[in-house]
Amino acid sequence: LELCAAPEKDESGDYRLGAWVRDSMAGIGTMTFYDPESGIFGALGHGVTDADTGKLLPLDHGSIMDASVKAVKRGERAAPGELKGDFDLTRDSGTLFANTESGIFGKLSAEDAEKLRTQALPIAGKSERKTGKAQILATVEGKETRAYDIEIEKIYSSSGSTRNFLLHVTDEALLAQTGGIVPAMSGSV
């Protein structure tokens, strides 16, 4: 990356040059789907955006790694809460190749793909979606993925929006622990 910039004088008469650079992003998120045939996965269900500008962050390359949820900040009205955790920095579980409005996408390592192969579940096609009782799979403590009860209240038509449906958490254990869906759970299926 090459840039040209001209320094400016500050109040004391000294020339200064300011630069705002972001070279990485990190966070805990949820894998939404995995294709056992190709090893391709999608996660989050929404793009990763710059906290200051709200714009989608460009992604040249990246890695995913295992994470463990260490704490939950319970969500309340007007305060979304969050999952807090640690990354396993000793090995990559796969590579990232895209950050889009619909989520991040990548390919799992052969070792991690094999671990998930026996846990793969079929997903409903667009025509199979319906309102009513359902379950999401989420990890809100340690590395244990559990099923939680929800109610799908409304399905939105595909108007180009990344918003697909409105759900209501009905699972008492999840409500007690997190208060509902908190950031880092948005890719839960």
Residues covered by each model-derived region:
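Catalytic nucleophile loop of clan PA
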Residues: 178-189
